Swiss-Prot record:
Cited InterPro entries: BTB/POZ_dom (IPR000210), SKP1/BTB/POZ_sf (IPR011333), WD40_repeat_dom_sf (IPR036322)
Stored Gene3D superfamilies: Potassium Channel Kv1.1, Chain A
Family recorded in the similarity comment: Belongs to the mimivirus BTB/WD family.
Coiled-coil parts of chain: none
Sequence ranges assigned to domain BTB in this UniProt record: 16-89
Pfam families tied to this protein: BTB (PF00651)
Protein name per its UniProtKB record: Putative BTB/POZ domain-containing protein L85
Bias type Basic and acidic residues, positions: 263-290
Spans annotated as Disordered: 250-290
SUPFAM superfamilies in the cross-refs: WD40 repeat-like
Organism this protein belongs to: Acanthamoeba polyphaga mimivirus
Length: 419
């Protein structure tokens, strides 16, 4: 075959008509190649050679190209002649990641089969892996591998918010959380209908609906109107704090505008400003683990809710027409992104209406991160049972379950078996 003759000539150099100098941050490699071969095999080199022939007056028989990795780019060029040519100077995981980056630089697709070589990536390779993710438009198989390889103690602040959002979108959210009949917190797998964790609480919360799940994969907050508890799912431990505190501060501005703004944003940013002022003025009085930082008076009842703040180091709750912000130093902070669906940020494509269904008794609507919607309704006013229906984002019904108690979706909690 013709390509075999070109391959032999790489060593003989009788008909090579171009010298390419491949340069990166650490090395420089010269290769004698055939213009015909590299232009046919690679659009990047075709454009590069054409551009240089039009702009350079001197001979166009030697070109210098700055590449991400000179050694691996050399291997890719050799692959134009011989598909079996490889390089063993790097560990397999690094060679694979660097090769994807180099092929992207050269405007070449990468073979999805090489992803199979990435079963294990050491901690020092995560940064490089994140770079590869960004240039591959968050390839599903790569996102799955990132989930497998990223360690529990990894600092998520080093990961761009876009990748975190993508990670959540690939999470398999099959857990719901509810209060049991014996003052226990239950975690259920909605696909298998099996109880996967049962955490006994030593404070009475009964059938409260005030349950929220943190995005740091292990914390659940629960409230009964007087006390809130923080439950570490991984350790099956609970801590509690009552709302009553000697430290209470009222906002100096009691206008309706401030109140409505606080309600709509759930205090994710507005209370943070009050928080910083309160901390600086009353630092000596703060409690060792928890600090009730600010209280904002409202002109009307916004409803009974408890939420995590945007930075997930604060609990926000409403009681007696007042909104409180409670700082939680005990648990690690976690930066997360906010979503503005009105502006269609982060590719919010679906705004489907479910008009064909009757939702007269709906008591709760929540969403899974993988394009599923759960809504809840009571059977009737005389029956305490709740019907929960899971829908695809486009409105197709997937599953209906009935619970005696209200439930919440644990979007990001890990699968934890009962010990």
């Amino acid at each position: 075959m013709l390509i075999n003759k070109f391959k032999k000539d790489l060593k003989l150099k009788e008909y090579t008509d171009l010298t390419i100098v491949l340069k990166d941050d650490t090395c420089e490699i010269e290769m004698n190649v055939h213009k015909t071969v590299i232009c046919i095999m690679c659009k990047y080199f075709e454009n590069f050679i054409k551009f240089n022939s039009q702009t350079e007056k001197k001979s166009n028989d030697k070109l210098t190209v700055i590449v991400p990795n000179a050694l691996i780019t050399r291997d890719i060029i050799r692959n134009f002649y011989d598909k079996t040519s490889t390089n063993s100077e790097y560990p397999l995981w690094r060679y694979t990641l660097e090769k994807i980056m180099c092929r992207d630089f050269l405007m070449l697709d990468y073979d999805s089969e090489i992803i199979k070589d990435l079963e294990k990536i050491p901690s020092e390779g995560i940064t490089l892996f994140l770079e590869v993710l960004s240039i591959t438009n968050y390839e599903f198989s790569l996102m799955t591998l990132l989930k497998k390889n990223i360690s529990k103690g990894y600092n998520f602040k080093n990961i761009p918010s876009k990748i975190i959002d993508e990670l959540y979108s690939y999470t398999k959210p099959n857990i719901i959380v509810c209060m049991g009949n014996e003052n226990n917190l239950e975690l259920w797998n909605i696909e298998t209908n099996k109880l996967i964790n049962n955490i006994k609480l030593d404070k009475p919360f009964h059938h409260t609906t005030n349950i929220v799940c943190s995005q740091n994969e292990s914390i659940i907050a629960i409230s009964d109107g007087q006390t809130f508890g923080l439950i570490n799912v991984l350790k099956n431990t609970c801590i509690y704090k009552t709302y009553q505190s000697k430290i209470k501060y009222s906002s100096s501005n009691d206008s309706d505008e401030d109140a409505s703004e606080t309600e709509s944003e759930h205090n994710s940013e507005t209370e943070s400003e009050h928080n910083s002022e309160t901390e600086s003025e009353h630092n000596s009085e703060t409690e060792s683990k928890h600090n009730l930082e600010t209280k904002i008076d409202l002109k009307y009842n916004v409803g009974n809710f408890i939420k995590f703040s945007r930075s997930h180091n604060k609990i926000i709750f409403e009681r007696d027409n007042e909104i409180f912000l409670w700082k939680i130093i005990f648990f690690p902070n976690y930066e997360c992104s906010s979503y503005d669906y009105n502006k269609k940020k982060y590719g919010c494509d679906y705004y489907n209406s479910y008009d064909k269904k009757k939702y007269k008794c709906v008591v709760n609507i929540d969403g899974f991160p993988n394009d599923k919607l759960l809504y809840a309704k009571k059977i009737n006013n005389f029956n305490p049972k709740h019907i929960y229906t899971i829908y695809g984002i486009k409105g197709n019904e997937q599953k209906t379950i009935i619970f005696d108690v209200p439930i919440k979706i644990a979007k990001y909690l890990p699968m934890v078996k009962i010990s």
